[in-house]
Swiss-Prot record:
Mg(2+) binds at K193, D195, E196. The lineage of its organism: Bacteria, Bacillati, Cyanobacteriota, Cyanophyceae, Synechococcales. It comes from the Bacteria. One of its GO terms (molecular function) is monooxygenase activity. HAMAP family: RuBisCO_L_type1. SUPFAM superfamilies: RuBisCo, C-terminal domain, RuBisCO, large subunit, small (N-terminal) domain. The gene is cbbL. This is Ribulose bisphosphate carboxylase large chain.
Length: 470
């Protein structure tokens, strides 16, 4: 028996720290931000992460002789300092693709973050980024439809889509809920949506809501001549109930359903995405609970990882924050998410938080959704940041209009079309935002009132989770 298989305990770095290793194109690469306990060498901390997230255990075991450990083990091949942080460092780890079940995001996350975060040798650990090899991506179904198909289904081109969450999000009866949906859609929105925590409560059972929403959509389409939709939340207590709700939405001829992908889980989400593809249904994804996982700058999973995983698991729209609204997220970081959702190839760019080149092959893109504390004054910045392949959702910024939800929807539609027209004419819409909106307000009393109502409303808080750049 060779020395390395002698019984006992040995340091992780003897096996899992391999600074001379050159990653293969087929390797899954991960970047962890590590903060070790005082006195533990960086190489030992990084190697421990590589070991526990792949083949390692705390003791040398005889059964290692029954496999090729050198082939299957994760390898920490590089360590970098974190700019501006003397306590933490980046550990870059390569995993052979055979460690993971083909196309299973659940299995990837179970391996990479399932147990290692509880290590005593670590004070903090954060998964910053993953490079999925194209061989793994080809095993994932991805978005059930994608951006181009969704535009064709909804017959909407050349601009961002407009939506809003129904407010109050809890407490309305099914009939009154449908009434609010109708007001928003007839006013000019493309979509309305259930909020993340609307499922099937005593005040509003899901069948009742679905039926009244379907009626509201039909009336709004007849009145406006436009295709409309509402994100019907099918998230449920069991997969069987989830599919029952999805099937009922299909029976009502609805174009889109919704899922809370983190609370619902990646297994449920992947299954629902495949159902949507088979049944011609669009799938909106809410990220409820994400900040519990991604907001701490030293511990958890960065949202760019969750966004990548969602694109692979499947969804046609995903919330990404707004930059300018009430939710966390700076501009460069958010642009990094948007790139990962929509582009076919995303180069390494630390200024946007992307640690690796990411080739998405021919996988369809996902609409980026801006939602949370936005109103008409934000419209120029939103159009500039998110571009056309996005959904801009104004909840309070629609329903809070003094003349009601229909007027709020009309104000948002006029503001959007004014910004798109100005952009297409070559104007710098962020610099000229006030002039563009005030000019449009002269021809729209709904917009003029909205501009006056929201003129003092700002959310100027510093970002907690900032990019680690010099």
């Amino acid at each position: 028996m060779s020395k390395k298989y002698d019984a006992g305990v040995k340091e992780y770095r003897d096996t899992y720290w391999t600074p001379d290793y050159v990653p293969l194109d087929t390797d899954l690469l991960a970047c962890f931000k590590c903060t070790g306990q005082e006195g533990v060498p960086k190489e030992e901390v990084a190697a421990a992460v590589a070991a526990e997230s792949s083949t390692g255990t705390w003791s040398t075991v005889w059964s290692e002789l029954l496999t090729d450990l050198d082939f299957y083990k994760g390898r920490c091949y590089r360590i970098e300092d974190v700019p501006g942080d003397k306590e933490s460092f980046y550990a870059f780890i390569a995993y052979p693709l055979d460690l993971f079940e083909e196309g299973s995001i659940t299995n990837v996350l179970t391996s990479l973050v399932g147990n290692v975060f509880g290590f005593k040798a670590l004070r903090h650990l954060r998964l910053e980024d993953i490079r999925f090899p194209i061989a793994f991506i080809k095993c994932c179904a991805g978005p059930p439809n994608g951006i181009a198909v969704e535009r064709d289904r909804m017959n909407k081109y050349g601009r961002p889509l407009l939506g809003c969450t129904i407010k109050p999000k809890l407490g309305l009866s099914g009939k009154n809920y449908g009434r609010v949906v109708y007001e928003c859609l007839r006013g000019g929105l493309d979509f309305t949506k259930d909020d993340e925590n609307i499922n099937s409560q005593p005040f509003q059972r899901w069948q009742n809501r679905f039926e009244f929403v379907a009626e509201a959509i039909k009336l709004a389409e007849q009145e406006t001549g436009e295709r409309k939709g509402h994100y019907l939340n099918v998230t449920a207590n069991t997969p069987e109930e989830m599919y029952e709700r999805a099937e009922f939405a299909k029976e009502l001829n609805q174009p889109i359903i919704m899922h809370d992908f983190i609370t619902g889980g990646f297994t449920a989400n992947t299954g629902l995405s495949k159902w949507c593809r088979k049944n011609g249904m669009l799938l909106h994804i809410h990220r409820a609970m994400h900040a519990v996982i991604d907001r701490h700058p030293k511990h958890g999973i960065h949202f760019r990882v969750l966004a990548k995983c969602l694109r692979l698991s499947g969804g046609d729209q995903l919330h990404t924050g707004t930059v300018v609204g009430k939710l966390e997220g700076d501009r460069q970081t958010t642009l990094g998410y948007i790139d990962q959702l929509r582009e076919s190839f995303v180069p390494e760019d630390r200024s946007r938080g992307n640690f690796f080149d990411q080739d998405w092959g021919s996988m369809p893109g996902v609409f980026a959704v801006a939602s949370g504390g936005i109103h008409v004054w934000h419209m120029p910045a939103l159009v500039a940041i998110f571009g056309d392949d996005s959904v801009l959702q104004f909840g309070g910024g629609t329903h809070g209009h003094p003349w009601g939800s229909a007027a709020g929807a009309a104000a948002n539609r006029v503001a959007l079309e004014a910004c798109v027209k100005a952009r297409n004419a070559g104007r710098e819409i962020e610099k000229e935002s006030r002039d563009i909106l005030m000019e449009a307000g002269k021809h729209s009393p709904e917009l003029a009132i909205a501009l006056e109502t929201w003129k003092e409303i700002k959310f100027e808080f510093d970002t907690v989770d900032k990019l680690d750049v010099q």
